[in-house]
Regions:
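Charged, often Cys/His-bearing segments associated with DNA-binding zinc-finger transcription factors
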Residues: 1-44
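Short acidic (Asp/Glu) and glycine-rich catalytic loops that position anionic groups and cofactors
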Residues: 18, 50-52, 113
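A broad, structural surface signal
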Residues: 36, 40, 70, 74-77, ...
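Trp/Phe/Arg-rich N-terminal binding region typifying the photolyase-homology
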Residues: 54-66, 79-126
Length: 161
């Protein structure tokens, strides 16, 4: 039994929300920052339905959207923080809330949820390849340069098989 066996795919609404941090604070955080980049491009980099193979189709509770967790893993690598600190930043850091596209008062995931998602990416080649393709897409658009590109290279080293 794996982490997601009892969960259905959680989805984000394709319609924007006026109350999310990215809608209200993107300029404050910096549109050209790594956080601003993820706020603008995260939905194109990681689509929830692309991770559907990791989830049960028709029963169980709804999961945290995998697109949100994928962005959280990038933020964690970028900021070089532990799982516990990643959870705390998702809960309280304005930059992370903007990048994740969540409301200010949202606590989006548990530490164990982030850990299980990472484990599924490592275990499932298809999910790992999807993650890599998304990062290559961003690189091709010219969005991953300098420090941002080093984050991608760090992910590649972690997932070498």
């Amino acid at each position: 039994m794996h982490c997601w066996e009892r969960e259905m795919l959680g989805k984000r609404s394709p319609q924007g929300d006026l109350f999310t941090a990215d809608a209200q604070y993107l300029k404050f955080v910096g549109e050209d920052s790594f956080y601003g980049f993820l706020a603008r491009e995260g939905g194109r980099l990681f689509r929830g339905e692309d991770f559907a193979a990791l989830y049960c189709e028709d029963n169980g509770r709804t999961s945290v959207p995998p697109s949100l967790l994928a962005i959280a893993l990038l933020l964690q690598t970028h900021d070089r923080v532990s799982d516990g600190e990643a959870k705390a930043r998702a809960d309280f850091d304005l930059r992370w809330k903007v990048a994740l596209g969540i409301e200010i008062d949202t606590r989006p995931f548990a530490k164990s949820t982030l850990q299980c998602f990472r484990a599924q990416l490592v275990i499932h080649e298809g999910a790992r390849q999807l993650f890599r393709r998304s990062l290559e897409y961003a690189k091709g658009l010219g969005h991953l340069k300098g420090r941002k590109m080093r984050v991608v290279q760090s992910w590649r080293r972690r997932w070498r098989t």
